[in-house]
Amino acid sequence: MRYHLSALVLVFTAFRETLTAPTPGNNTIPLPNRLLHQWPNGTWVENISVRPNGNLLVTTSTPDGSVWQVKEPWKENPEVERVFNFDEWVDRLIGIGETQDDKYVVVGSRFYSTDAQSSHVARTFCAMELDFSGNTTEPSARLIAWMPESYLLQGVAALPWDRDTVLISDQYVLRPRAVQIDWTPSPGQIWVLDTRTGEYGLVMTDYAELNTTYAKGPDVGIDGIKIRDHDLFWVNQDDSGIYRVKIDDAGVPVAPVKPQLVASYNTMWDDMAFDPFNENVIWATGLNAVFAATLDGQIVPVDGVGTSDNLTLPGPTACAFGRTEKDKSILYVTGNLLTVPESLLDVKLGGW
């Protein structure tokens, strides 16, 4: 068995027939796919966002906290370049989300080492902005806010009606030290951040549906988040659930707060994307597979483990649909391998 970290972007053709009714017997499953780009060993690609021009932006956690761009990803061999290194503020990046057109919030922190399983340094998480709106080829960047009370900032989602305000998921992982010594189950939480002023605050915590329980080992709870209309959706890596809750115009859950279980599947969720054609379908990355889930609770793996092609998906971390006429039916997936065994049926994920 080899041990290294390898990062990649995969492309999946998401046929509308599959989107409409994902079922285990669908003869389009597994979906057609191809490898779009693979970074050198030692690179950890964590999250993805799609620019208005269709280019992909991906964040890296190793060897440094950078944003990379995959240009015109619908091409056979797209150009890939680093567009910004955030080393002034962080060692690693995790989440990325678009606010205004071609403006993005990224989150990250200092870490004890560049090792893939290194712990973050306590009280060093922050939110930063990457701005292409003034120059589409050479973005500017700024620090929005230090968020020292946070633990492991993860997903970023803008409020659709106020895109300068974002919600950020926070995985309470007790690892702000070089060696983990406490595996007490811990709560997850969600922050709201005004990107104009840098003001932030907690909007949701102390709910079992957000929490880390370590049911699957030293894993995290709440992970990727998305907002559609006034519904906040999230995945919980630890308890296998996809959830949603109503939020108000300030991004605060509407009382009485009772998170709704949308769907459940025995996997380790990481992130999700809304279907561009069918509001009843969510796409999500899990343990070495991509899944399609309906809001009435149906879930089916569409690529990777659980289909006839178990070797497609090594450690997927995030996914996003294309935004142009050329690729609006294409799902782009980032992935990492931390431990590379002979079979992906037992692979260990390399993402948060």
Curated annotation (Swiss-Prot):
Glycans are attached at N26, N41, N47, N135, N211, N310. GO terms for molecular function: isomerase activity. Disruption phenotype: Abolishes the production of eupenifeldin. InterPro entries: 6-blade_b-propeller_TolB-like, Hetero-Diels-Alderase-like. Putative hetero-Diels-Alderase; part of the gene cluster that mediates the biosynthesis of eupenifeldin, a bistropolone meroterpenoid that acts as an antitumor agent. The first step of eupenifeldin biosynthesis is the biosynthesis of 3-methylorcinaldehyde performed by the non-reducing polyketide synthase eupA. Oxidative dearomatization of 3-methylorcinaldehyde likely catalyzed by the FAD-dependent monooxygenase eupB is followed by oxidative ring expansion by the 2-oxoglutarate-dependent dioxygenase eupC to provide the first tropolone metabolite, tropolone stipitaldehyde. Keywords: Glycoprotein, Isomerase, Signal. Eupenifeldin is a bistropolone-humulene meroterpenoid first discovered as an antitumor and anti-leukemia agent. This metabolite also shows anthelmintic activity against the parasitic worm Hemonchus contortus, anti-malarial activity as well as antifungal activity. This is Putative hetero-Diels-Alderase. The lineage of its organism: Eukaryota, Fungi, Dikarya, Ascomycota, Pezizomycotina. It comes from the Eukaryota.
